[in-house]
């Protein structure tokens, strides 16, 4: 059971299979489907995803973090048809690792506020 000030942070880290890169239509379609989950799946409370910006041996190619208010929301997301569509797309082109952690919403607010100050040049 989550405390009132907690969210589940669902993190996924994708690594392309051999022969796949961002020049692949399959990769770009999987990316677009994943970016659109926030518009299709109401259980998602927050959603951030994108390509890796550096090329290092230990880097992944794409990652996401989704925020959920409850384990039942996370469970509903997992079986949602739009999520399953994305799973099938990524399965064809990548392997991935998942981590679900609890995050304190006060900590999240502090991170967002700090980012706002940086963006304002303070």
What spans do the regions from the language model cover?
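Short S/T/G/P-rich N-terminal loop/turn motif that feeds into the first structured element of a domain
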Residues: 1-61, 69-76, 99-122
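Conserved short beta-strand edge segments in small beta-sheet-based binding/regulatory domains
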Residues: 87-102
């Amino acid at each position: 059971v989550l405390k009132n000030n907690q969210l589940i942070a669902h993190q996924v880290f994708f690594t392309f299979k051999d022969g796949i890169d961002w020049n692949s239509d399959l990769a770009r379609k999987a990316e677009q489907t994943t970016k659109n989950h926030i518009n299709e799946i109401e259980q998602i409370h927050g959603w951030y995803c994108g390509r890796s910006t550096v090329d290092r041996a230990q880097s992944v190619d794409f990652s996401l973090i989704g925020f959920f208010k409850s384990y039942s929301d996370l469970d509903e997301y997992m079986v949602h048809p739009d999520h399953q569509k994305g799973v099938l797309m990524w399965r064809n082109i990548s392997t991935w690792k998942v981590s679900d952690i609890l995050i304190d919403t006060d900590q999240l607010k502090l991170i967002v506020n700090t980012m706002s100050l940086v963006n304002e040049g303070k």
